[in-house]
Amino acid sequence: MSLLARRALIRALFLILLPATSVAGTRPTHEYDLKAAFMFHFAQFVEWPPEALPDRNTPLTIGILGEDPFGKTLDDIVANEAVRGHRLLVRRFQNVDQVDSCHILFISPSESRHLESILSHLDRRSVLTVGDTKDFAQRSGIIGFVITQKRLRLAVNLAAANAARLRISSKLLRQSEIVGPLRVQE
């Protein structure tokens, strides 16, 4: 494991073991540095069905749909890294039709107005959807980054994870808020 990846993992582990991470007074760049570390961390604490990663030659792909808020940070963290024998690969997409080979997909805030159609396109596919738009997990995304009281927290939609046939580690779930879908008021 490279020094940069090790530092990112240590930072992510430290942050995940705290009840919440303070982002008070941080620049957006720093916020997305933390989120990039979490994205790497998610790859280690989620299990995909065998057909999603059929052999060791299949890379575990982290995708970014829409505008990229991470810059080079995510690429630097996963460079020369592997999870369960699968090398990590970062790809950027402008269209949801391109993301079929992704295992983790960060849906950028730039795509928020298309979120329902994006999630519908990915329905029942083994893609860990991650985002930071308002109510992301409640709107059927799997992991949402939430800032509450100036702290970075995770919201996890277990029903969406189960539909995607993804198994999320209890270690990650213990540090997350478990949420369900938003109910439409009539």
Task: List the predicted regions and their residue ranges.
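Short hydrophobic alpha-helices and adjacent helix-cap/hinge residues
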Residues: S2-E186
